Amino acid sequence: LSVRSRVAKAAGGAARFASRALGRGSGGMIGGEVAMRISPKFLSELAAPYSSVIVTGTNGKSTTTRMVRAALESAGPVASNINGDNMTSGVITALMQGRGATRAALEVDEMHVPAVAADVNPAVFVYLNLSRDQLDRVGEIGSVERRLRDGASAHPDAIIVANCDDPLIVSAAADNPNVVWVAAGAGWGGDSAAYPRGGRVVRSGEDWHLIPAFDGEALPELSARPKPQWWLEDVELAPEGPRATLRGPDGISVRLELKLPGRANLGNAAQAVAAAVAMGIDPAAAAAAVSSVTEVAGRYSVHDVN
């Protein structure tokens, strides 16, 4: 770090400590805010030693980030914004706390992806899903897709682990030469009836394809659901947690037996394992680590009440 950034790191750490000591919060944002004010280049310098994964999307960011972190921890310490502080200042604070870590699992708000990625230079992006959310803050869904598209296209060497069941995510990732397609589930599809690059989406079971929205409309080169490289089989929504076999490239087959509830979390787990494998983690170790996650910043936790 430069002298200015070392001062910024010390000041940010002090601000975080003061926030916690005074009961004003976890300090997950204020530490990064202070550091960034002192040294605008602080994040790029701080992130340089890390091999990072950026996780983004409308739903499932915190859960998937927690799963990615668990998988990466099978190979050593990991820096991560575990409390969901997912804007630039929260990412800074997470990396400041990553003592001994060379990898980072970072949840990033959709609208902050291009700016954070420009400084972090991630090895892997995880694009989960897109739907209308917080319209007063982020605007229409098309503008969010454009942000994610810009984030991916600015990093052609990065791997994009993208949900091929969501047409908006497919559009955001399609220009990158290193996409890993995961069949993670479509969820709500009403916001992807119109495709950002032209055409309308027609769904048939798990598949989807584009048709012209008007006579003579040209369709984009990628005009149908990409063939997934990772997919789930033998899905069982058991009372103790969802289970499935995750298939991947080169004959990979690993078992997911999640502690977290719901079909959606199987999709999150599939993308987390795919991201970890892209970072060099053994598939079986990644699946076991992801399956061991029991709570996410207090969510899904179980308490005995007398």
Feature map (PLM): residue ranges:
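Extended acidic/charged loop-beta regions that coordinate divalent cations
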Residues: L106-D133, S171-R255, A297
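A conserved segment at the C-terminal end of the G1
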Residues: T63-S80
